[in-house]
């Protein structure tokens, strides 16, 4: 099974592809999709959609795992994040991928053993858990790897 993990965002979206071959997890790829905050929102969403579509076409995942979001005190920020999630979910649906959502605390607990772990702890643990991730330095990318890892570990 190949899982596409997604840390949804409008400005800096993290993605990662992790495969399971028999009992072993294998990191395949990851990256960041950055958009310019000065661009109009529909153009930013289109860029996220087209870039993530290239990832889907290249790696052919069976499932997408996406981090659930919380409602921010800033309603505009929450709304923009909702737009990004909608664009992502629409793409997932268009390619008929199974999808699972995970709460941030569940991802943190699965990867670090502690549901309130800091970003640097997640980054450290994914480097220990999945060979090939040592070059990752961006926390959004690390979160996406952690989300894909969690999806595999939870056996969903």
Swiss-Prot record:
Homodimer which binds Holliday junction (HJ) DNA. The HJ becomes 2-fold symmetrical on binding to RuvC with unstacked arms; it has a different conformation from HJ DNA in complex with RuvA. In the full resolvosome a probable DNA-RuvA(4)-RuvB(12)-RuvC(2) complex forms which resolves the HJ. InterPro entries: RNaseH-like_sf, RNaseH_sf, X-over_junc_endoDNase_Mg_BS, X-over_junc_endoDNase_RuvC. It catalyses: Endonucleolytic cleavage at a junction such as a reciprocal single-stranded crossover between two homologous DNA duplexes (Holliday junction). One of its GO terms (biological process) is DNA repair. It comes from Rickettsia felis (strain ATCC VR-1525 / URRWXCal2) (Rickettsia azadi). The active site is at residues 7, 67, 140. Signal peptide: none annotated. Mg(2+) 2 binds at residue 67. Pfam families: RuvC. SUPFAM superfamilies: Ribonuclease H-like. Keywords: Cytoplasm, DNA damage, DNA recombination, DNA repair, DNA-binding, Endonuclease, Hydrolase, Magnesium, Metal-binding, Nuclease. Mg(2+) 1 binds at residues 7, 140. Belongs to the RuvC family. This is Crossover junction endodeoxyribonuclease RuvC. It is found in: Cytoplasm. The gene is ruvC. The RuvA-RuvB-RuvC complex processes Holliday junction (HJ) DNA during genetic recombination and DNA repair. Endonuclease that resolves HJ intermediates. Cleaves cruciform DNA by making single-stranded nicks across the HJ at symmetrical positions within the homologous arms, yielding a 5'-phosphate and a 3'-hydroxyl group; requires a central core of homology in the junction. The consensus cleavage sequence is 5'-(A/T)TT(C/G)-3'. Cleavage occurs on the 3'-side of the TT dinucleotide at the point of strand exchange. Its cofactor is Mg(2+). One of its GO terms (cellular component) is cytoplasm. Its main location: cytoplasm. Binds 2 Mg(2+) ion per subunit. Its EC number is 3.1.21.10. One of its GO terms (molecular function) is magnesium ion binding. It is an enzyme of class 3 (hydrolase).
